[in-house]
Amino acid sequence: MGLAFPPSHQNDAVQNLRRWLKESRVHAWIGVLIACFALQTILEVLGWLGHVNLEGALLSYVALPAWANWQIGQIWTLLTYGFLHYGFMHLLLNCVMLYFAGHMLKTFWTDLQVVRLFLVGIITGGIAFVLISLWSPGWNPLMGASAGVLALLLAATRMSPRMPVYLLGIFKVPLWVVSAILLFISVAGLSGENGGGQVAHLGGALAGWVLGRSPEYLTGFSWRTSRFGSRAPLRVVREKTLELDAILEKISKVG
């Protein structure tokens, strides 16, 4: 016996989802991560049915390998690895952490600054992974948005270390305790099987801590604005100066 939902309920669900995704860039990026994981899953299933490793082909192009297998020409993998995940629980944990860390930081920053730090954290974590893998060439390819999530968490911690957080919805602790626990786990896991992932976590955390007091560096400006934008204010000042000179000249003539 199947269940069928009225079309009106289906439309409401779709509209609510669209509204939620548009409410915040953080929500939108959660949607991106879920969509990418859905693509991974579809390719895995299709590959299994056709006896072709389609997901492996995707990962070879998008995941971030260790230095020994990484080519500088694939520079985009320093970012794109953050859109992929090893499994559903990996995705779920990062999405939940992104939601809460992102909204905590939005207390102090703009929506755009939060998302840009998330992406910077992913890139910084990727760079740390590639560099340290010089001494650990056997690391598995890196995937996951954890470095970006930790960047947000550390930035929020630097802005407000005593912000109350409820662990498991019960235990009230300051935010710095949560960050300290996660950093300890990453440091303790450096020599473990996921040492490369822990290095990326610490790289993202470092980016969040450094930029935590300098969100202005995450404020957008285009190359066009940075190169030519200063001319407009000068022109306005010059025009106002000429107008003022003309007025003063008229006043002097009148007496």
Feature roles, as predicted:
Residues G2-I251:
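A detector for small-residue-rich transmembrane helices and their helix-helix packing motifs
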Residues V254-G255:
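Short, Lys/Glu-rich amphipathic helical modules
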